[in-house]
């Protein structure tokens, strides 16, 4: 099979790092090194070069898509003879635990909000739509947190549907990784943003992933552009363990932390527990429920060591 035949056989355009970086064009870097440090995750080496070569071209592409969507809305309003109602553009970001979804989401929020159009960009994680621990315990699902059955999908779909319908304000519950639970009365209010970034394990899932709870509309039905952050499983496991060890030295030392009892563990024991958690929960969820959604994404970013993106696939 020739290279052209291989290209025609896939629904994606494929770029290596150099090819993708060239698509930045002349987009200026609007973030300082200090701001990037604040945006990056606990376990990631995020450089100015990474932002310039990977995330600036991505923000440029998204800006084109968003502008095109606004023009399409204007055409519809002209046809209907109606005044414009602001309908948010929804970007979904999916991928495994520890792959760096949150950093990608925060970076895009910062970059997209600094385009000349000064668009308002809100960020919501689907963790907020996990059932509270009390419910998960009652249903025997604490070891399935993050699996499809651990989410209140009806509430999540209702939230995204209301945002996408242009509701004045919509309320989302907030999840705390410190207490490992939904924050009581910790709701976040979303007020008609131009862009909503929805980050979570499950934003690309569909009816096939929820046979236990059949319903006909899914989060993916409301997503305008979706990104899957990918990496080999051996790297994901290593990043998860390293993140666990850093939390053990930091967040776990807080007496309010759900995992406070892990703070004083010897490192060898902590590695053993983190490895077990990966194999029994996160790695299993990746194989069964997350990885199968990858090819539904509009764009796939594949990372190598040190969280550096080595290739990008963009749906044709």
UniProtKB/Swiss-Prot annotation:
Q: Does the keyword Magnesium apply?
A: no
Q: Which residues bind ATP?
A: 95-102
Which pathway is recorded for this entry?
A: Cofactor biosynthesis; coenzyme A biosynthesis; CoA from (R)-pantothenate: step 1/5
Which terms are listed as keywords in the entry? ATP-binding, Coenzyme A biosynthesis, Cytoplasm, Kinase, Nucleotide-binding, Transferase
Matching entries from CDD domains are given as: PanK
Disulphides: none
Which Gene Ontology terms describe the biological processes this protein takes part in? Answer: coenzyme A biosynthetic process
Where found in the cell?
Answer: Cytoplasm
- Enzyme's top EC category: transferase
A family per Pfam: PRK
Which EC number applies?
2.7.1.33
A GO cellular component annotation here is: cytoplasm
Q: Which GO terms describe its molecular function?
A: ATP binding; pantothenate kinase activity
Which PANTHER family does its entry note? URIDINE KINASE
Family that this chain belongs to = Belongs to the prokaryotic pantothenate kinase family.
Query: NCBIfam families annotated for this entry?
Result: panK_bact
Write down the HAMAP family for this protein, in alphabetical order: Pantothen_kinase_1
Instruction: Quote the protein name from its UniProt record.
Output: Pantothenate kinase
User: What does UniProt list as this organism's lineage?
Assistant: Bacteria, Pseudomonadati, Pseudomonadota, Gammaproteobacteria, Enterobacterales
Q: Which gene encodes it?
A: coaA
